[in-house]
Amino acid sequence: MAPSSVDSASLCSDIPNSAPPSPSTALSSPARSSPPPQHPPPAESTGLDDIFGSSPPPTAGLSAEPPHTASSSHCEPSDLPSLRRQHVTAGYRDGISAAKHEHVQRGFDAGFPVGAQLGMRVGVVLGVLEGLVRCSPSASSSAPGKRSESGTTAAPSLDILQLYDLAKSELAVQKVFGGVAEIDSEVKPEQDSRLKLEKAGEEVVSKWEETVMRLLGNRS
């Protein structure tokens, strides 16, 4: 074989090895050899994080709070206890006022008729005694046992005057209804309170009515 033909054949065999790579091979080869992406490390929080918007979530700030600070925030004074005491006191006073008004009105409605009836009877007794005192000779103008110009003695006038003063003392409101406390033990609790008033006043007023009627019978 001629040298020229051998050289040409060797040159032809070397041409494909030195040919440039195809475009597809050039584009795909770097993708296979590229390293994985690296994420940057988390930035540390600083005092300016709130300004630039990179501050940690609120839970992180609460967890970083010292224990004594967190406990002291729960122990701060509040207005709720004082407001509760004020409302309790105001409600207590309003309840007392409402109950007092209701029971006072109920007691007035129940006791007024009883007191009016007894008062009229007491007025009759005192009026009769006062009339007898005015009709009798004055005790100051005559001595006891001495006859006056009309022929009567002054002793009866003194008796009527003393009787009139005693009647005014015993027929006072405090004395007439003073025995209600003693009658509480005799009257049953379920009975009406008007029975207590009637029973307490009836004893005193009836006694003086009998006294006046007896006195009028003696003078007639």
UniProtKB/Swiss-Prot annotation:
Polar residues bias locations: 1-11
Record's function text: The complex LTO1:YAE1 may function as a target specific adapter that probably recruits apo-RPLI1 to the cytosolic iron-sulfur protein assembly (CIA) complex machinery. May be required for biogenesis of the large ribosomal subunit and initiation of translation.
One GO term of the biological process aspect: protein maturation
The entry's keywords: Cytoplasm, Nucleus
Residue ranges with Pro residues bias: 33-43
A GO cellular component entry from the record: cytoplasm
InterPro entries from the UniProt entry: Essential_protein_Yae1_N, Yae1-like
Protein name from the UniProt record: Protein YAE1
Intracellular or extracellular location(s): Cytoplasm; Nucleus
Predominant cellular place of this UniProt entry's protein: cytoplasm
Domain of life: Eukaryota
PANTHER family the UniProt entry points to: PROTEIN YAE1 HOMOLOG (PTHR18829:SF0)
Region described as deca-GX3 motif: spans on this chain: 91-131
Residue numbers spanned by region Disordered: 1-81
Organism: Coccidioides immitis (strain RS)
Pfam families, per the entry: Yae1_N (PF09811)
